[in-house]
Amino acid sequence: MKKIFVSIASYQDPLLLETICSAYENAKYKDFITFGVCEQSSNGIDLDNIKFKNQIRYELIDPVMAKGPCYARSRIQSLINDEDYYLQIDSHMIFYQGWDEILIKYFNWLQQQINSDLVITGYPRSFKANESLDEFELNIKYKDTLGITFREGRIFEDGHYSMQKSYPANTDLPVQGLLVAGGFIFSCLLYTSPSPRDNRV
């Protein structure tokens, strides 16, 4: 089995530990998962109480010194070692059982379909957490693929950010896109390593 590097940038997020544990516990090949975490928080997670702490490369930054997610993701990239795949996520996610095997198989299938370099990206489904943050309800109301595009007339307009909108793609299969969602990126490290995150953004 090939190795996956999971990049998690976090800013004072109470779900960070749940995210890490969900990824580990639901991975089919747990020994092949490595986490790179940059936590911008007053009180970091307690690594000593995590049974797989040797699989976590961790940096804690005082929130006063925080410079946003791109800065944190840039720092995380320096923690990559000999992994084969790169998964960049937000610090408030839950994972499906066997997600690691599913993603790698899906990536390999897509490679065969388009015969080109690629990244899998998108907005993960939302979920609701209970007060103790140990039970989650996944939003599964819409099951087809939604494409993402720019709003006409709002692309690089002075005084405005480039607004996006989603549209039904009328399929449950993936669609080619022109945008990347920073909260979920999966690819072969061979493709993602030449695209470093700019720590000045």
Per-range role (PLM):
Residues 3-193:
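Catalytic cores of eukaryotic secretory-pathway lumenal/extracellular enzymes that build
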Residues 191-201:
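Single conserved hydrophobic/aromatic residue that forms the stacking wall/gate
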